[in-house]
């Protein structure tokens, strides 16, 4: 390469070679592919893997991001994913000696919000159908089942939407969010749904709707019933009421391989409570999950909690924390994985860094403290150095911590950092113009 030539990174090279069908797609590529590329470099993905993942993003994800923001930065379709309604997210998972990059987005199209798609249902269905051929085992039976249960005809959706004055609630009524994990040479797809619109239509509790829809899978759900029953008992318990627990949404794999033996269902609970003891109550399902592994998990959770959350000095374990960013979505989220044949669910907690966390670089330092406590020492475990290299530009953070999730599997912690790209750091809607699509 000549000294005057500039070496393109994979996200730039793919853009130059593949182009875009609209300025909107080029905008979202600029805002989405850059941080994803940086995250893959952090996770030590090979160049070939970086191209594979970015090619998937270009073909299947970018066209579903919808119109770019208005010039004032306001989103075309406002979602619950972040306090500023950014509909995209990148994340990196750490487990033992592996780092895995993931993405999530709420599919949106130009018809979202119109009479032809009042509550944004079309883009999710279209995206999954387009991806159906991707891999053996990629199966839409469950999506079709749950869509039948919770999607509304457009005429009904239009009437119900017009009656909802609480627009924050409407934004939380996500009919479909898609997330992708990118382990070596594979793509794993997960669909998340919230039956809020069906709840508004019928008046039935959200938790009842979710659990009944899982039971309605019939024989395919038989292996999940034991874990589901444990979760149901907790949701209906006084401990759950005391902790302010509300069922929020659920998710499921579309990779229904091995006759469903490798497929998860996740049920998400939310609470506005932030006292550490309440977190433990929910994480352990009121003590239903117990034993030496759970003891190790709660000890590790305490360290991670204090490492990334801005806990006031002297705060007692029964005291709640006041959010730095007061917002209806400033909740602590939990999910409980249920697997076929498992006797109890597997818990995960999402620490809400965007609302209760320390400044981003202090969170990074806290992650280093936690990683060292786990004995993690791979190059990608140098969290502060890697975070600064990936997401610090001219002393400004370009991707903010939104959540830090924690679970415990076997002998070790399972931790994921979720980031909200600062869109104006990559493509400021007020000044951005396409370079490739002209």
Curated annotation (Swiss-Prot):
It comes from the Eukaryota. Substrate binds at residues 102, 190, 264, 266, 268, 350, 414, 418. Disruption phenotype: Abolishes the production of the janthitremanes shearinine A, F or K but accumulates 13-desoxypaxilline. The lineage of its organism: Eukaryota, Fungi, Dikarya, Ascomycota, Pezizomycotina. This is Indole diterpene prenyltransferase janD. It is an enzyme of class 2 (transferase). Indole diterpene prenyltransferase; part of the gene cluster that mediates the biosynthesis of the indole diterpenes janthitremanes such as shearinine K or shearinine A. The geranylgeranyl diphosphate (GGPP) synthase janG catalyzes the first step in janthitremane biosynthesis via conversion of farnesyl pyrophosphate and isopentyl pyrophosphate into geranylgeranyl pyrophosphate (GGPP). Condensation of indole-3-glycerol phosphate with GGPP by the prenyl transferase janC then forms 3-geranylgeranylindole (3-GGI). L-tryptophan binds at residues 80-81. The keyword Transferase applies. Belongs to the tryptophan dimethylallyltransferase family. One of its GO terms (molecular function) is transferase activity, transferring alkyl or aryl (other than methyl) groups. NCBIfam families: arom_pren_DMATS (TIGR03429). It comes from Penicillium janthinellum. Pfam families: Trp_DMAT. The keyword Transferase applies. Keywords: Transferase.
């Amino acid at each position: 390469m000549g000294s005057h030539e500039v070496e393109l990174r994979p996200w730039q090279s793919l853009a130059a070679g593949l182009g875009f069908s609209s300025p909107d797609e080029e905008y979202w590529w600029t805002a989405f592919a850059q941080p994803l590329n940086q995250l893959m470099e952090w996770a030590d993905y090979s160049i070939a893997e970086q191209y594979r993942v970015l090619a998937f993003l270009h073909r299947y994800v970018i066209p579903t991001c919808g119109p770019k923001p208005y010039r004032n930065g306001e989103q075309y379709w406002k979602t619950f994913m972040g306090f500023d309604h950014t509909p995209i997210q990148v994340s990196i998972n750490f487990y033992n000696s592996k780092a895995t990059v993931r993405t999530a987005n709420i599919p949106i199209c130009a018809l979202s919000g119109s009479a032809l798609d009042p509550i944004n249902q079309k883009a999710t269905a279209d995206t999954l159908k387009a991806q159906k051929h991707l891999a053996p085992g990629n199966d839409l039976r469950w999506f079709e089942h749950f869509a039948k249960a919770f999607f509304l005809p457009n005429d009904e959706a239009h009437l119900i939407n017009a009656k909802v004055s609480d627009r924050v609630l409407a934004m939380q009524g996500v009919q479909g969010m898609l997330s992708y994990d990118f382990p070596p040479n594979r793509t794993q797809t997960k669909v998340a749904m919230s039956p809020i619109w069906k709840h508004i239509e019928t008046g039935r509790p959200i938790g009842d709707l979710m659990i009944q829809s899982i039971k309605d899978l019939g024989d395919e759900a038989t292996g999940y019933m034991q874990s589901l029953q444990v979760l149901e008992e907790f949701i209906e318990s006084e401990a759950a009421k005391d902790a302010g627990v509300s069922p929020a949404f659920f998710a499921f794999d579309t990779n229904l391989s091995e006759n469903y033996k490798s497929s998860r269902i996740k049920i998400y609970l939310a609470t506005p409570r932030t006292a550490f003891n309440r977190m433990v109550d929910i994480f352990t399902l009121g003590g239903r999950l117990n034993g030496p592994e759970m003891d190790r998990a709660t000890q590790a959770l305490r360290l991670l909690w204090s490492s990334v959350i801005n806990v006031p000095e002297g705060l007692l374990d029964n005291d709640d924390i006041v959010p730095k960013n007061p917002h209806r979505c400033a909740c602590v989220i939990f999910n409980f994985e249920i697997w076929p044949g498992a006797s109890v669910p597997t818990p995960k907690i999402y620490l809400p860094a965007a609302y209760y966390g320390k400044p981003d670089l202090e969170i990074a330092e806290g992650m280093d403290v936690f990683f060292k406590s786990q004995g993690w020492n791979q190059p990608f475990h140098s969290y502060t150095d890697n975070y600064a290299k990936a997401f610090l530009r001219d002393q400004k953070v370009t991707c903010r911590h939104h959540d830090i999730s924690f679970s415990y599997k076997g002998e070790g912690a399972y931790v994921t950092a979720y980031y909200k790209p600062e869109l104006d750091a990559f493509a400021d809607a007020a000044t951005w113009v396409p370079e490739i699509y002209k």
